[in-house]
Regions:
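Intrinsically disordered, low-complexity Ser/Thr/Pro/Gly-rich regulatory segments
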Residues: 1-76, 81-248
Length: 248
């Protein structure tokens, strides 16, 4: 084995170890915690830790509601990837965080396993975010102003420990993916069975070996391609105060 091959083998094993550790933590929570709500919260926190460790500091990750300037609000989302530097969260109360829709890059649901019901549920959660109104304003620079940009499509996915189908992420799984535009799942990871994404249009599936790191690196590439979120029209949010005064 050459030195280069040895280095690659070491790196490959390190990536596998990260996946094994997360899988063990989730398995331990599932076997030692009886209350389903508490179990879900612990597993959700494990996924949040992984995302915080591997995403660059320009991104913030949290469980949150997503809101818009028209008063719309999403379902509670297990894991929201949003802009860290340019967009403050609003109305934070303890663990209840509210993130402006314009700040959101991606949303994920954390579930015990992949099955038809959870895929549908994740799609509905994604739609509750994608249907929100997003503003965009011009950005001033030394030579004038950049025109307002159209918001990019928000990425949506699902995170689980395993697939409930015997063959993992197979044709049966694919046939149960949501098909409505607002409910589409762009990516997902089932630790013990593999990962998938359609960032380039065609659905790509990865087996269990290195699935977690493969998923994270593919997600990093997708987030990188989105660039920066649009500049928020804060006056639209300020107008909420006047709108409520006019109500009888």
């Amino acid at each position: 084995m050459t030195a280069e091959q040895s280095d690659l083998a070491w790196m490959h094993q390190a990536f596998i170890d990260v996946q094994t550790e997360l899988s063990f933590k989730i398995q331990r929570a599932n076997s030692s915690i009886g209350h389903s709500g508490a179990k879900g919260a612990v597993n959700e926190e494990h996924w949040l830790e992984i995302f915080r460790a591997y995403l660059p500091n320009r991104y913030e990750v949290a469980s949150a509601f997503v809101i818009d300037s028209l008063g719309g609000r999403s379902h509670q989302i297990d894991l929201v990837v949003y802009d860290r530097h340019y967009t403050p969260t609003l109305l934070d109360q303890q663990s209840h965080r509210y993130v402006p829709a314009e700040a959101v890059y991606a949303v994920f649901e954390c579930k015990p396993h992949l099955d038809k019901a959870y895929l549908q549920y994740a799609g509905e959660k994604a739609a509750s975010v994608r249907r929100l109104h997003r503003t965009s304003v011009a950005i001033t620079h030394a030579g004038g102003a950049y025109s307002p940009r159209a918001p990019f499509p928000i990425v949506a996915g699902i995170l689980t420990a395993r697939s409930s189908w015997a063959d993992g992420i197979d044709d049966t799984f694919i046939n149960h993916l949501p098909t409505e535009a607002d409910e589409l799942l762009d990516c997902g990871c089932a630790l013990n069975d593999g990962a998938f994404d359609r960032f380039e249009g065609e659905l790509k599936v990865r087996g269990a070996d290195g699935a977690l790191i493969h998923f994270l690196f593919r997600l990093l590439g997708k987030l990188q391609s989105l660039g920066t979120v649009t500049a928020i029209d804060w006056s639209a949010y300020a107008s909420i105060l006047d709108a409520t005064k006019e109500e009888p």
